[in-house]
Amino acid sequence: MNRIRPMRATTICSIVASGIFLLASTQSQAAEKDIHSSPPASFKKVSTLVKLPDYLPGMGTLYVDPKTLPVGPFLGYDRAGHLVNVIYMVPLKEMDEHKAFTNLGSVAAGLKINHTDIEFNAGHPGVEEPHYHVTEWLISHADHEKRMK
């Protein structure tokens, strides 16, 4: 009879530990799923912050946490409202000064990147100085060409 009690305690501990693991895993998946269909609460639509259209062909509808400007990350959503890219806008001046950019994009941690594009931009509303767009795409290049017009 003493042998049964330790087994039951072990079983109960295993069940509780499994439940905690599943809860944490489910919450992590829910948070990740949420960012795929809508940005975090601290992110604002870029078109409400600067004079830009709601949808930018080739980039999508962009959202950014204003505290992270000018670098971002900017979250880009396609016309159907799906997250398709994460963009950083890195000013040339800061690169020339050898500034370190650390822990960028923790809001997007765990996303599966398909490919990365790096493109020069001479400046636009919101980031007027010359900078590079570092775009981490979550969709293939072919999908990018097709969906982001």
Predicted regions and their residues:
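Bacterial N-terminal signal peptides
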Residues: 13-24
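Metal-centered catalytic cores of metalloenzymes
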Residues: 30-149
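Bacterial N-terminal signal peptides that target proteins for export
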Residues: 2-15
